[in-house]
Amino acid sequence: MNNYSNLALSKSKGRIFKEANSLYRTPFQRDRDRIIHSASFRRLKHKTQVFVNTEGDHFRTRITHSIEVAQISRLIAIHLCLNDDLAETLSLAHDLGHTPFGHAGEDALNECMVNFGGFDHNLQTLRIVMFLEHKYLKFKGLNLTLETLDGLLKHNGAIDDLSTVNRLIGLKSFKNKINFTNSGSLEAQISAISDDIAYNNHDIQDGIRAKMFNLNDLIEINFFKDIYKSHKNNIKNNNKDILIYQIIRDSIDLMVRDLIKNTKNNLKTNKVKSLQDVYKLEKPIVCFSSKFLKIEKEVRFFLRSKMDNNKKVLLKNNHGKKIVTKLFYKIKKKPKQFLNADHLKNDPNRAIADFISGMTDRYAINLNKIF
């Protein structure tokens, strides 16, 4: 096993607001714990991944997805001798900013906010951990390490448009402690691609459970067909449930193996010897080989055609959009009925967006009934 510990973010440069160090935990372990104990993290258990949580007890929610992403991230980071605590922290936090009703809710809220700076769930995650969580006397937010903030900012890669960050968060809030021009750390890159691995595979499992497609549909993709062939004769009584679990398990394993191997090749090819080398590279270092990029593209196309374009999903998404839109304009008429004056005084529209984005599916549905 190669040791890339010299490329790890092993030490923190601190936080926006100074704090004494813990006797028992590293700064990144404290970040992880602050996220786990936050109200925003708890609410993820009632937020849609693909299926509204009232549709079944075994479908994934945002919280189960985040835990699965964290598990994959830790595995990769440990193997590469990087900071697994940081990779886990970023993974647990990456979806905090999601609205109720998944991406449909986000689209609706973004449309409502189009003349007021827009809405972006990734940047909303930063708003939550920097301003909206209230647990400390001396500062707003969770006061996470600079490395965690940087990783959350760069979940989708280097920042191209600082104006959006400035509108939704305010560059001054970072007190010149974040380098916006650098690429993300290896830990941030690991978290981002672990997100892809998790939802591509687990959405397949949920899609089959929801009877949107079946095993025969899945094995039309050669990647899954090969895995299926390697197991079909070993499963007693042709138990399809066990077979599907095994296929998904092997799929994740093969993707992780390819990712690790290709990342090592990228580090060698690009002569990455230091953290500065990581920051300077404009393209991701942690990524799949061309073969697995093609497989990932096939899987995404399959999921779009079978799930995203499914009539039931489209109807649910449309219903979720209508609820979010209705809530926005109803609350806007009487904002003081729902929000305190301090939150409303700076930017009432942003305060309403903060409020709605923090709702669970259940809370939004129940509030909509009142209106």
Identify what each model region corresponds to.
Residues 89, 100-117, 208-216:
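Post-HEXXH active-site segment of zinc metalloproteases
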Residues 56-64, 93-100, 113-116:
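Short coil/turn segments at secondary-structure boundaries
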Residues 92-93, 110, 344:
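Conserved short loop/turn motifs at secondary-structure junctions
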Residues 76-77, 109:
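Broad structural signal for hydrophobic residues in well-ordered alpha-helices, predominantly aliphatic
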Residues 1-66, 70-76, 84, 118-123, ...:
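Histidine-centered, transition-metal-coordinating active-site segments
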